[in-house]
């Protein structure tokens, strides 16, 4: 995610994104996001400058731009760009650590023609790991949503439910099956995986008959494996 103020372009956040393995229930939707990215140094060295050149070339002066990449042994390759706010609510994480809120800046720009803040404090190297767990549902009508066991818990930063009791979910393999997102932070990858387990224990979404509606959530073992940690 890049924030742009009066022609100054700043890298605000770099995430690693894990795709859902529920291939029969959804398309390739995002299951889990974590920042800082393990590819941060490689990205800054190889890609960041080129992205800034691109944004300057299109005349970007004020706003927010987001890019998606695939990183593997062949390097880092871009496949999608948006000159807009992305869907992961990254402004909440950036605001927490850097006191910069690009959502408010965009509102300010739409009303006054000025972003209303500077990028002096912008820094994508956050002091903690910050993660987002995405929640998807089977088809049906929601009869119960309970996450009370997570409210106020250490590490839980934000619970954003996009669905409520009575909503009908159509099983069509799109973001229409998304129930919401839970953001959390910790000092280590091991702590992040522990919070994922706790979320699974303390979150309930059922249909009118009391059946579980949650699709299988992100497997924390994938994160440990990617980070080379024995779990």
Predicted segments, located by residue:
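ATP-dependent carboxylate/phosphate-activation module, predominantly the ATP-grasp catalytic core
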Residues: 2-60, 64, 71, 82-110, ...
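PAS-family sensory/regulatory modules and their coupling/dimerization elements
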Residues: 1-2, 143
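Peripheral (often C-terminal) accessory segments that flank ATP-dependent C-N-forming ligase machineries
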Residues: 107-231
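A short glycine-rich, hydrophobically flanked beta-strand micro-motif that places a catalytic Asp/Glu
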Residues: 2, 61-73, 118, 214-219
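Active-site proximal loops enriched in glycine and acidic residues that flank catalytic Cys/His/Asp
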Residues: 69, 80-83, 137, 186
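Pocket-edge structural micro-motifs
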Residues: 13-16, 80, 137, 163
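Extracellular/lumenal ectodomain signal focusing on beta-strand-rich modules
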Residues: 11-13, 80, 158, 181
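Conserved protein kinase catalytic/activation segment
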Residues: 75-77
């Amino acid at each position: 995610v890049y924030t742009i103020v009066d022609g100054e372009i700043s890298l605000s956040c770099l995430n690693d994104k894990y795709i859902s393995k529920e291939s029969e229930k959804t398309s390739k939707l995002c299951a889990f996001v974590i920042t800082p990215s393990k590819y941060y140094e490689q990205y800054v060295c190889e890609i960041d400058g080129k992205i800034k050149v691109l944004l300057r070339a299109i005349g970007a002066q004020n706003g927010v731009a987001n890019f998606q990449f695939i990183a593997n042994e062949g390097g880092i390759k871009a496949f999608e760009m948006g000159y807009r706010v992305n869907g992961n609510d990254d402004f909440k994480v950036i605001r927490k650590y850097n006191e910069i809120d690009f959502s408010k800046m965009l509102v300010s720009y739409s009303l006054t023609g000025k972003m209303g803040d500077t990028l002096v404090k912008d820094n994508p190297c956050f002091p903690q790991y910050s993660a987002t767990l995405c929640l998807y549902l089977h088809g049906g009508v929601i009869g119960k949503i309970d996450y009370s066991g997570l409210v106020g818990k250490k590490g839980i930063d934000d619970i954003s439910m996009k669905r409520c009791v009575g909503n009908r979910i159509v099983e069509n393999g799109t973001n229409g099956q998304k129930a919401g997102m839970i953001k959390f932070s910790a000092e280590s990858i091991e702590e992040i995986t522990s919070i994922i387990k706790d979320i699974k224990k303390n979150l309930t979404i059922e249909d009118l008959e009391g059946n579980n509606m949650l699709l299988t959530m992100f497997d924390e073992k994938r994160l440990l494996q990617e980070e080379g940690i024995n779990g």
